[in-house]
């Protein structure tokens, strides 16, 4: 076998490989002889089929198999001989395998960069810490009480905030009734904002039996595109008004929600508030860590990974209206530059974390994958069981989660064992403002 190195610089390794025809022919002859002992052909006893007959029937497929095997073995030899740390499948080009010439081909191999892990102990980050107070918990209790109000008392008084109103309504645009603009026996809590902005407010002050004209404008982002941004008039018939019975928040109230006492329900809400904030805090901290890492990394990355990441980014932005709006006023050149920079950041950090996980011998446990699946499920409220079933029945989908799961594990290990974390306490209101500001900053990161 002859090997001529054509290129060995950066992350590209190209070589021209040739194998004498005699070696190929020898392999073909051995394979055909083996087949004479195995194949069954009408008119010949088992093991007694002439080579010429076997060659006529199987010669082409045997030759193709031998050539493919030779190519794979040659490429593997080159990789091992030159100690190449490859990514992806080697590309075979300029293949010459005519019967009167040697087997020749060019192999192009993309390499992973050599990664030096920076001194992570020099990195310091603030770690937000939520301090849940009694006011936060009482707000949750009041929300729960509001959701479980019992609207049994019919009212003849004027409609006010908090009342439950039963209505019939017909919607008109330019005095023409529009499709899906009719409501029958529809119940709405005034002030819940369940209807188009401004609709509920215009019912306040009316009474049972009244007919009310409600004028509204559909939001620009309304789900029915043919109605978005349009003015509409609804003729509303007030059929019934009910007020809520006062809800007493006590031990009996708590028992309706699988708690033995009100104190136990308060403890449950305290933990719930902490857990809900923890995921958002971890996401922000992860991005802040990546900001620090980005400044420390300057190694080249494989072009194939870069292109793959750019395509993922573009596809994700096309499906996300908020992300798309951030780029709508940018020129084509600016958008390309943005994607290039962001893709480079992501690929570099991804490669670093993979190398770090390898250096620390971090292994995925079943619980690590469960956490990632739980995170995925939380993105689809009300459809959690569907998400769990999807991953349960799709092993290949589980494979796709292993990369992100290992990355998360590496990040948590860095938080726990490497960088300096300075705890910074926040009230719930302060934390919400901080997280909102941070989320806007890292929307596309």
UniProtKB/Swiss-Prot annotation:
EC number per UniProt: 5.2.1.8
Record carries keyword Cell inner membrane: no
Domain PPIase FKBP-type stretches: 162-247
GO molecular function per UniProt: peptidyl-prolyl cis-trans isomerase activity; protein folding chaperone; ribosome binding
GO cellular component terms, A-Z: cytoplasm
Any single GO BP term: protein unfolding
Main location: cytoplasm
Catalytic activity: [protein]-peptidylproline (omega=180) = [protein]-peptidylproline (omega=0)
Compartmental location: Cytoplasm
Alphabetical list of InterPro entries matching this protein: PPIase_dom_sf (IPR046357), PPIase_FKBP_dom (IPR001179), Trig_fac (IPR005215), Trigger_fac_C (IPR008880), Trigger_fac_C_sf (IPR037041), Trigger_fac_ribosome-bd_bac (IPR008881), Trigger_fac_ribosome-bd_sf (IPR036611), Trigger_fact/SurA_dom_sf (IPR027304)
Record key words, sorted: Cell cycle, Cell division, Chaperone, Cytoplasm, Isomerase, Rotamase
SUPFAM superfamilies registered for this protein in UniProt: FKBP-like, Triger factor/SurA peptide-binding domain-like, Trigger factor ribosome-binding domain
Any matching Pfam family: FKBP_C
The record's note on its domains: Consists of 3 domains; the N-terminus binds the ribosome, the middle domain has PPIase activity, while the C-terminus has intrinsic chaperone activity on its own.
Role: Involved in protein export. Acts as a chaperone by maintaining the newly synthesized protein in an open conformation. Functions as a peptidyl-prolyl cis-trans isomerase.
Family according to the record: Belongs to the FKBP-type PPIase family. Tig subfamily.
Protein name: Trigger factor
Organism encoding this protein: Rickettsia conorii (strain ATCC VR-613 / Malish 7)
């Amino acid at each position: 076998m002859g090997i001529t190195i054509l290129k060995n610089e950066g992350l590209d390794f190209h070589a021209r490989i040739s194998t004498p025809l005699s070696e190929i022919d020898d392999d073909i002859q051995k394979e055909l002889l083996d087949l004479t002992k195995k194949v069954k052909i009408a008119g010949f006893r088992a093991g007694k089929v002439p080579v010429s007959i076997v060659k006529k029937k199987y010669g082409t497929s045997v030759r193709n198999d031998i050539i493919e095997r030779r190519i794979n073995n040659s490429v593997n030899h080159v990789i091992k001989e030159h100690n190449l740390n490859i990514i992806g499948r080697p590309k075979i080009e300029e293949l010459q395998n005519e019967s009167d010439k040697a087997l020749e081909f060019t192999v192009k191999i993309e390499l992973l960069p050599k990664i030096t892990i920076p001194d992570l102990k020099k990195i310091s980050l603030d770690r937000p810490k939520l301090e849940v107070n009694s006011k936060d918990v009482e707000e949750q209790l009041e929300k729960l009480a509001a959701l479980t109000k019992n609207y049994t008392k019919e009212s003849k008084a004027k409609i006010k905030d908090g009342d439950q109103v039963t209505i019939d309504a017909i919607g008109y645009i330019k005095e023409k009734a529009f499709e899906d603009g009719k409501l029958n026996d529809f119940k709405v809590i005034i002030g819940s904002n369940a209807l188009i902005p401004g609709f509920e407010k215009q019912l306040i002050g009316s009474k049972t039996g009244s007919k009310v004209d409600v004028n509204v404008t559909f939001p620009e982002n309304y789900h029915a595109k043919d109605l978005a941004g349009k003015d509409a008039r609804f003729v509303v018939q007030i059929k019934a008004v009910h007020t809520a019975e006062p809800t007493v928040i006590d031990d009996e109230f708590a028992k309706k929600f699988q708690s033995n006492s009100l104190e136990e329900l308060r403890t449950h809400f305290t933990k719930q508030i902490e857990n809900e904030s923890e995921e958002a805090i971890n996401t922000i901290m992860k991005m802040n860590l990546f900001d620090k890492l980005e400044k420390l990394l300057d190694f080249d990355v494989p072009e194939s990974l870069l292109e793959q990441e750019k395509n993922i980014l573009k596809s994700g932005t096309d499906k996300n209206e908020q992300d798309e709006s951030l780029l709508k006023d940018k020129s084509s050149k600016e958008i390309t530059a943005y994607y290039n920079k962001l893709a480079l950041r992501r690929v570099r950090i991804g490669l670093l974390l993979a190398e770090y996980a390898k250096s620390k011998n971090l292994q995925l446990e079943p619980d690590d994958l469960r956490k990632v699946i739980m995170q995925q499920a939380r993105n689809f409220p009300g459809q959690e069981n569907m998400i769990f079933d999807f991953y349960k029945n799709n092993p290949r989908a589980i494979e796709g989660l292993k990369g992100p799961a290992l990355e998360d594990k590496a990040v948590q290990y860095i938080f726990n064992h490497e960088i300096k974390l300075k705890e910074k306490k926040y009230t719930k209101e302060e934390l919400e403002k901080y997280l909102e500001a941070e989320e806007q900053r890292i929307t596309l990161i």
